[in-house]
Amino acid sequence: NNVYNIQILDYNNTDYSHLTESDYVNCIADINYCVKTLIEKVHFNENKSENMNIYISSIKGNYIMIYKNNAWQIQDKKEQVDDLYEYNEIMLTNWYQEYMNGISSLE
């Protein structure tokens, strides 16, 4: 009988450190779904349970639950999903620019 205590991270403190170069490259290779793929790798990754700080009980519903300030909070789904998408799009763009600059400096 194993007991696992997982401390869920605050939505604003989501950990991206587990992502490897390969993870980012795979996201970018997914072309039309690159941001969605990144969100899945970060927030819906069973190997990184502490990042599972988003809960959508119904795809058709108007609300989403996020773990923030040590409690689950009900938020407007459209607004939160738009913010989540935008933030992860920026993360992916920043990683790509740094990656390309690193390649350029090697040439």
Feature map (PLM): residue ranges:
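Extended amphipathic coiled-coil helices
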Residues: 1-107
